[in-house]
Structure formats: C-alpha cells, structure tokens
Regions:
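Surface-exposed acidic loop/strand-edge motifs in secreted or periplasmic proteins
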Residues: 69-73, 78
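Bacterial N-terminal signal peptides that target proteins for export
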Residues: 1-10
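Rhodanese-like catalytic fold shared by cysteine-dependent sulfurtransferases
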Residues: 15, 20-53, 58-61, 77-80, ...
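Short hydrophobic beta-strand that contains or immediately precedes a catalytic carboxylate
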Residues: 55, 65-70
Length: 185
C-alpha cells in the first residue's frame, strides 16, 4: 500500500472505532450524575434523536421550541463590593430559550421548579409542542434535560446531541444568548 492508501485505511479504521464506541454507550436507568462531558448514547427512550441537518430543518420551519441547557457559573456571592463580574458569553441557536443548569442529574428544588416553569412558559403550557434540547457535543446535560421533560409529561421531546458544536461546524448561525432569570439570582 502507498503512504496515502495506508493513511486512508487508518482513518477509516479510526472512524469505525469511534462510531462503534459512541454507539456502544448504554442509556442509564436514571439521570447521568457525573462526567457530563463524555460520549453519550445514540438513543433516549421516548424521545426522537436528531442530527444537525434535521435540527436545521426544524429550526427553519419554526415547528419547535429550542432549549439550550448549557450550565452557567453563577456570580460568586462573596465578591467584594465594586468587583466587576462578567458572565462567560454563550452563543446559541437563534430563537432558543436558555435554561442553564437544568441538565444536571440531580437538581435543587428551586432549579427543578425553574426548569418546569421555564418549559411550561416556552411551550405555552402545550405538553404536545415539539421541544428540542441541546447543549454541546458529548454533553449529557441535554440528554438529562430531555429525559426530565419526558418525566414531566411532554410527548414531543427531541434530543439534539451535536448541540451548538454540530450547528457551528455546519456553518449555521449562532446568536449571543441571555439566560432566563433564575430564582436564586
């Protein structure tokens, strides 16, 4: 084999191995509780799983509400007076609602209530409205949030595991995001 053919064969083997590894991640019985930035399952029982091309079609059709669940570090409570604090910027899919910190495996009661009320507001109380959950690629937070929406009785739950990483890689637009206000802020 030539050098180019050997490199090509090696790349194919790596891609197959990577796909097999990602496909082999089982769904846990409950929520993922740690190591949130890790390969995710290919499925979420009760939800539809989509790739970027389908997410783009849904976005263009305005047929769903997109929910970003990327966490956001809170402003430290013990900052001295006069200390300048800047939130880390977040760019998400245009038109999305950002409900930060709602993808952890265990939620404080106030954050659980924030998620429930935020989702209710985003869907105008329509539990049959299509809701697309996302975060970043290889991020369990969107998986957990989508699973939580199913537990709340939402019937048209869509999980977009590629998140803003896949969206940006496809050359699609992102916009600066502002999170929905949290009760503890």
């Amino acid at each position: 084999m030539t050098g180019a053919a050997t490199r090509f064969a090696f790349m194919v083997i790596l891609m197959i191995a990577a796909g097999a590894t990602a496909a082999g991640v089982p769904e846990p019985d409950g929520y993922r509780l740690q190591d949130y930035r890790a390969p995710t399952p290919a499925t979420l029982q009760g939800a539809r799983v989509i790739r970027t091309d389908e997410a783009e079609m849904i976005w263009h059709s305005h047929s769903a509400t997109f929910i970003d669940v990327l966490p956001r570090p809170p402003r430290p409570r013990d900052l001295p007076a006069g200390t300048l604090w800047r939130d880390k910027p977040r760019a998400n899919i245009p038109g999305s609602i950002w409900l930060p910190d709602t993808g952890y495996g265990e939620l404080a009661p106030s954050i659980d209530d924030y998620f429930s009320k935020g989702l209710y507001k985003a869907t105008e109380g329509d539990h049959a409205r299509t809701v697309v959950f996302y975060c970043l690629a290889d991020c369990w937070m969107s998986w957990n949030a989508a699973k939580r929406a199913l537990a709340l009785g939402y019937s048209e739950v869509v999980w977009y595991p590629e998140g803003t990483d896949g969206w940006l890689a496809a050359g699609l637009p992102l916009q600066d995001a502002t999170p929905e206000p949290r009760p503890d802020e």
